[in-house]
């Protein structure tokens, strides 16, 4: 599992699991106000780190999701997690999940094929279509109230006694179902069934003509430096971005 957090200087499992409840005062797609959870993603196995970094960036970074005329640079931390025990999951994905996306991730295509083979009633299919539409909905900035249905459904799946799932799978809206699948996990499950494996420092650069996500180094789960070598030198990044200096890009926090 890949989890992303904006900023750097985070090296421990405590830094990289769930946001403090004090910072969770508003609705999100998968959590109600004053609730916290572990947001992450599972990506296609042959390009797990690369694809997971892309999903995490677009889920977390307003700069990445903004229009092309917005420029800047941003520090981004990605963490890799090992699954120590199987997770009891439920997904909200069916054949109505981003039907216009031709290159849906392998995980989503697998779930869709399983859905097609399921013996469902008309009512079950209609309910599934409604929920799928909600989980694929683009929500405008400052309209978090539109997350009420998905956040409530996920809360019930995780905490209601008749369900009590460990985690919920749903598509990433910013990348429209490509590269992998999102997962939200209960905090106590993270403590018991997941383990921090590696931390990756990154820099995201966005000019008027191009954007790039660079690996700046990595750490093990004890905070020990594995590599301080940057994926690309600053001069090479500037050339790709069509700028003379990285200082032309304001730092976005």
Question: Where do the model's predicted regions map?
Answer:
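Active-site and NAD+-binding cores of ADP-ribose-processing enzymes
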Residues: 1-31, 66-253
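DNA-binding interface regions
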Residues: 32-33, 51-54
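Short, well-ordered beta-strand elements within core beta-sheets of diverse protein domains
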Residues: 36-47
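Active-site periphery "cap/insert" segments of enzyme catalytic domains
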Residues: 47-49, 159
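Short active-site loop/helix that positions an aromatic residue
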Residues: 53-64
């Amino acid at each position: 599992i890949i989890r992303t957090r904006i900023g750097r200087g985070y090296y421990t499992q405590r830094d990289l699991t769930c946001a403090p409840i004090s910072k969770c005062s508003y609705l999100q797609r998968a959590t109600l106000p004053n609730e916290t959870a572990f947001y992450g993603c599972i990506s296609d196995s042959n390009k797990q780190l690369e694809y997971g970094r892309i999903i995490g960036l677009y889920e977390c970074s307003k700069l990445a999701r903004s229009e092309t005329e917005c420029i800047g640079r941003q520090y981004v931390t990605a963490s890799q997690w090992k699954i120590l025990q199987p997770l009891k999951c439920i997904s909200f994905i069916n054949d109505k999940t981003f039907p216009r996306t031709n290159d849906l991730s392998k995980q989503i295509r697998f779930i869709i094929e399983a859905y097609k083979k399921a013996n469902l009633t008309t009512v079950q299919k209609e309910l599934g279509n409604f929920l799928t539409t909600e989980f694929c909905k683009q929500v405008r900035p400052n309209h978090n109230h539109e997350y009420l249905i998905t956040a409530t459904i996920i809360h019930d799946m995780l905490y209601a006694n008749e369900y009590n799932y460990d985690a919920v799978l749903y598509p990433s809206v910013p990348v429209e179902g490509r590269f992998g699948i999102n997962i939200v996990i209960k905090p106590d499950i993270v403590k018991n069934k997941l383990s921090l494996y590696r931390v990756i420092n990154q820099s995201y650069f966005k000019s008027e003509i191009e954007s790039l996500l660079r690996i700046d180094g990595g750490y093990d789960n004890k905070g020990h430096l594995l590599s301080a070598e940057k994926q690309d030198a600053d001069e090479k990044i500037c050339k790709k971005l069509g700028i003379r200096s990285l200082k032309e890009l304001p730092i976005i926090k």
